[in-house]
């Protein structure tokens, strides 16, 4: 096996490939410290917030299962020399994507409110096994989580549309509502 590194090139000639993959493929990537501290992860940097391209393989916040995380790393950067990083939303550890981190309480509250009011929209791309019967639709499921010892259930709604597909895989645009 080969661990992908930044700037590695992967050629994809056509999404509608005909060869069937008979085994599960799992890409595990953990960025190096050099990559995490490089300026290439910063998309926007101003006095109130940063927008970064969060790599897969690293958690946003510390937790029981994650030793390194984006917030602790940002604390050590020049961009947060005189500021404290505030998370305003999260992305799963294994997901690559845009992450906004506030540099002060005022912008943390503002950006958190904009996410809560759905003024800032998240969109994901995903590859799933098989072809979907419908090109557009809504996925509704129930999620469970705990607040302390209390089990909370909430509805999860995601709209999807098929961008491309073949007999084996479908490339989807996913827009979570909740």
Locate the predicted segments by residue:
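RNA pseudouridine synthases
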Residues: 1-178
